[in-house]
Curated annotation (Swiss-Prot):
Cofactor, free-text remark: The D1/D2 heterodimer binds P680, chlorophylls that are the primary electron donor of PSII, and subsequent electron acceptors. It shares a non-heme iron and each subunit binds pheophytin, quinone, additional chlorophylls, carotenoids and lipids. There is also a Cl(-1) ion associated with D1 and D2, which is required for oxygen evolution. The PSII complex binds additional chlorophylls, carotenoids and specific lipids.
Name used for this protein in its record: Photosystem II D2 protein
A single GO BP: photosynthetic electron transport in photosystem II
UniProtKB keywords: Acetylation, Chlorophyll, Chloroplast, Chromophore, Electron transport, Iron, Magnesium, Membrane, Metal-binding, Oxidoreductase, Phosphoprotein, Photosynthesis, Photosystem II, Plastid, Thylakoid, Transmembrane, Transmembrane helix, Transport
Source species: Arabidopsis thaliana
EC number: 1.10.3.9
Stretches that traverse the bilayer: 41-61, 125-141, 153-166, 208-228, 279-295
Length: 353
């Protein structure tokens, strides 16, 4: 008896095969299965943001003007978070809050929940798109892994942090000035700049910028002479098969500058991947900690001595006073529904006063 080994082929294509052929067809803009998640979610997230910043007020949720229609500009317009009283409601258009009324839904902050959720799924869809394309052209999936850093930051800041607090109200609104105010809030209420996870995030992002600048300059400096052109771009031939720069020369240069240098390209480029992605993940972990109200570094001995000795003050104790001022001002302004009134004697003052 003979057993034939071979690839099983179906006589005719089923619906899945037809869909797969169409979605993964070679075209100018790749769609793919990930596109079924990415494109609708990105469209709705961006559309919701443009709609909110153009037309929708924040009067009912924050007591603010936040749209172009009310006189804001690109830096001050925002899609604001729902009111504190709505807690963690999903704010569905057909839910008990809006009851199908689109105008009321916008007034309650429904667009923020809409943009945040669709934005998160759009980012995940973009990462899956990189996985799918990498698999199609037989690349390793490090682009997608790197993009997990921005996704982690977005999800931790816009979703996990407010879930740990009393409601979506305490998430950032989607706007430039709104994000700045959220950063001030993080500093005043969480002392974020003295949080070790924030420090690792700053080191990762700024370190990555430094690495990019050094790497780009080094490659430009060690390019081979490919032709008689007047500059790098005229002389460069995009179809040449050989390498365009000298790793040996670059290694020798940085060995003389620093005493150490990367010995091969794999280690160099992995390090350029590792530094920013690790920084972003550390920042995301720190924000998850803030969602649970974990504290940053506290130098209590300095605070006690500053309270006892009017002549003793450090940059740390000055910053603690500044944080108290931020809390005293922002709490009353951002949460008018709480009717917070601080008497003059509890407002922070420097030791000199």
């Amino acid at each position: 008896m003979t057993i034939a080994l071979g690839k099983f082929t179906k006589d005719e294509k089923d619906l899945f095969d037809i869909m797969d052929d169409w979605l993964r067809r070679d075209r100018f803009v790749f769609v793919g299965w990930s596109g079924l998640l990415l494109f609708p979610c990105a469209y709705f997230a961006l559309g919701g943001w443009f709609t909110g910043t153009t037309f929708v007020t924040s009067w009912y949720t924050h007591g603010l003007a936040s749209s172009y229609l009310e006189g804001c500009n690109f830096l001050t317009a925002a899609v604001s978070t729902p009111a504190n009283s709505l807690a963690h409601s999903l704010l569905l258009l057909w839910g008990p809050e809006a009851q199908g009324d689109f105008t009321r839904w916008c007034q309650l902050g429904g667009l923020w929940a809409f943009v945040a959720l669709h934005g998160a799924f759009a980012l995940i869809g973009f990462m899956l798109r990189q996985f799918e394309l990498a698999r199609s052209v037989q690349l390793r999936p490090y682009n997608a892994i790197a993009f997990s850093g921005p996704i982690a930051v977005f999800v931790s800041v816009f979703l996990i942090y407010p879930l740990g607090q009393s409601g979506w109200f305490f998430a950032p609104s989607f706007g430039v000035a709104a994000i700045f105010r959220f950063i001030l809030f993080f500093q005043g209420f969480h002392n974020w700049t003295l949080n070790p996870f924030h420090m690792m995030g700053v080191a990762g992002v700024l370190g990555a910028a430094l690495l990019c600048a050094i790497h780009g300059a080094t490659v430009e400096n060690t390019l081979f002479e490919d032709g008689d052109g007047a500059n790098t771009f005229r002389a460069f031939n995009p179809t040449q098969a050989e390498e365009t720069y000298s790793m040996v020369t670059a290694n020798r240069f940085w060995s003389q500058i620093f005493g150490v240098a990367f010995s091969n390209k794999r280690w160099l480029h992995f390090f350029m991947l590792f530094v920013p992605v690790t920084g972003l993940w550390m920042s995301a972990l720190g924000v998850v900690g803030l969602a649970l109200n974990l504290r940053a570094y506290d130098f209590v001995s300095q605070e006690i001595r500053a309270a006892e000795d009017p002549e003793f003050e450090t940059f740390y104790t000055k910053n603690i006073l500044l944080n108290e001022g931020i809390r005293a001002w922002m709490a009353a302004q951002d949460q008018p529904h709480e009717n917070l009134i601080f008497p003059e004697e509890v407002l922070p003052r420097g030791n000199a006063l």
